[in-house]
Amino acid sequence: MNRLELFNILQPIVKSVTGVSTVILANQVQSDGTGIPSPSGEYITIEPKQSVAQRGQANIHRNTSATPLSLDVDVRAQIIVEVDINVYRGVDAISRVSRLQECNKRPDVSSALRTNKLGWQRVSTPNNLTRMQSGNPEQRAQCYVYLYYETTDAVTINSIESASYGIEYEDGTVVATGSVPD
């Protein structure tokens, strides 16, 4: 799942839960490489892939291939993605971002996550980043949302239909030979 796909899934969820209508993808640039100006008023940015980690070991599925003498192997890795969410301006940024905690229990949110094959792990403790800007306090808050999803990497390999073997002592004396299937 790429950055834009994750953003398109999360944007309506964040809009609905926080009540902020302007939710944009973080770190956008124009075609000339310059950053886009920030929106006026209260807005939220989402960086869908702040970091990507794995959970445990990948699940490996093996099936007989439609190709003769082959085996289909599908490696399915469980991915944990850290999503950075920032609320800017408005009246109470910390309250807006704290609404994301446990929002996965809402039926509309859990349905959207399930439809898109995403799991909701948790939300970090919201950070109050309000600072004085040009003599005026500018509201800002941040949290991280941790999501699960599964990737798949399928490959077709040749199957081993038979194998020969030989067992020898270190001096070269043959103890046994054979083949499987025999």
Regions flagged by a language model, labelled:
Residues Q54-G56, S95, D153-I157:
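Short acidic, gly/pro-rich beta-turn/loop elements at beta-sheet edges
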Residues S98-N104, I160-E161:
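Short amphipathic alpha-helices in soluble, non-transmembrane regions
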Residues S95, K105-D153:
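Acidic-leaning, charged glycine-interspersed low-complexity segments
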Residues N128-Y148, V155-D182:
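Structured partner-binding subdomains within large eukaryotic complex subunits
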Residues I13-V17, C103-S110:
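Conserved short hydrophobic interaction patches
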Residues P68-V75, M132:
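Short beta-strand/turn micro-motifs at beta-sheet edges
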